[in-house]
Amino acid sequence: MDNNRYDALKIENQLCFPLYACSREIIKRYTPFLDAIDLTYTQYIAMMILWEKKSVTVKEMGRCLYLDSGTLTPLLKKLEAKGFLTRVRSTQDERNLIVTVTEAGEQLRERAVSIQIGRASCRERV
């Protein structure tokens, strides 16, 4: 059997693996800073969308973050339980769920600014 035929399937020949490993490393380096504000990385990027847009549909947020509703729904419920956002059905189209940042969510933004300061030290170690 020709082993060269399978060389393309070796992990070191896959572009996807270094990207995956890099993504994992970035999240690992963010974790200590995010722990300080009691957010996961995915919750953090969801909040960044809300800080920028103030109010979005779940569908729009999913498009921005490349996440499906099955992943977003529990994440948004946890953020809502923490008081950082509200989820309300659209009065114009009840199929749409509108997510809006709360005052507590805006206050979290002020605390999250320190993430960007800490992130600079992450870049120095890479």
Language-model features, listed with the residues they occupy:
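N-terminal leader segment of winged-helix/HTH proteins
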Residues: 1-37
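Pre-recognition alpha-helix immediately N-terminal to the DNA-recognition helix
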Residues: 18, 29, 45-48, 107
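Short, locally clustered residues in the helix-turn-helix/winged-helix DNA-binding domain
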Residues: 20, 48-52, 113
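Charged, amphipathic alpha-helical coiled-coil/dimerization segments
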Residues: 27, 77-125
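Key DNA-contact positions within bacterial/archaeal DNA-binding proteins
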Residues: 42-44, 70
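Short capping segments at the starts of secondary-structure elements
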Residues: 53-57
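Residues within helix-turn-helix
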Residues: 58-59, 70, 77, 97
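The alpha-helix within a helix-turn-helix
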Residues: 62
